Structures are given as structure tokens and as C-alpha cells.
Amino acid sequence: MKKYNKSIGFYGEDLSAKFLEKDGYSILEKNFNCSSGEIDIIAIKDEIISFIEVKSRFSDSFGKPKESVTCSKQGRIINAAKYYLHIKKLYNYYIRFDVIEINFHIDSSKYELSFLKDAFRV
């Protein structure tokens, strides 16, 4: 099941990246990892760097995808974002923390994508 969930996650991240590019974002990084945590997508548009968590689900039986971005997870994303900004020397940008949630339909190839800008703050 874990391998299946990972492949759904990667598929969701690919769909999200395509959505963002179509919306005018430039993708800076995908799956940025450091000791503090991981960020699914880092993108920029209009001088705003967005740190984006992607959550994909087939069912709401465990809650909405965005609900799994807990305070603890937010803290790890924030720390990873601080590290990213430091190592890339990106000091003069506005930043934002977003969530993209994707709900897949089990019986078809359709899905619903929601882009939640400014989903949480430092």
C-alpha cells in the first residue's frame, strides 16, 4: 500500500507542477529535501516564492487532503523553506505557503484540483 500511495503522490505532484506552469509559475524545485523536512514544489510567480505541499487522495474517509497538513508538518515545511532560502541566497522575495489538494475519482481518470494559496503562515 505504501508503494501505491507514493506513486499516487508523485502523480499528484506532476499534475500540480503542470497546473502551476500553465498558471504562469516557474518551477524552481521539486521534492526538495533537507534535514528539516521536504517541500513538494517550490515555484515563483510575480516575485513571490511559493512553497507548496501537494496532497492527493482517492477518498475523503480520512478527511480532506489539506487536513493532513498538520501544525507539525507546517513547521517542517517552514524550516525547510528557511533553509532553502538561505542556501540559495534568496533574501529579497515575498514568500507564501500553499497547499494543492487533488481528489482522484476511483472509477475514472478524472480528478479535482484545488489550489489553496496562503494556506498557512509563519
Curated annotation (Swiss-Prot):
GO MF terms, alphabetically ordered: nucleic acid binding
InterPro entries per the UniProt record, alphabetical: Restrct_endonuc-II-like (IPR011335), tRNA_endonuc-like_dom_sf (IPR011856), UPF0102_YraN-like (IPR003509)
CDD domains from the UniProt entry: PoNe_Nuclease
Pfam families in the record: UPF0102
Family as reported in the entry's similarity comment: Belongs to the UPF0102 family.
HAMAP family listed in its UniProt record: UPF0102
Protein name in the entry: UPF0102 protein CPR_1677
Lineage of the species this protein comes from: Bacteria, Bacillati, Bacillota, Clostridia, Eubacteriales
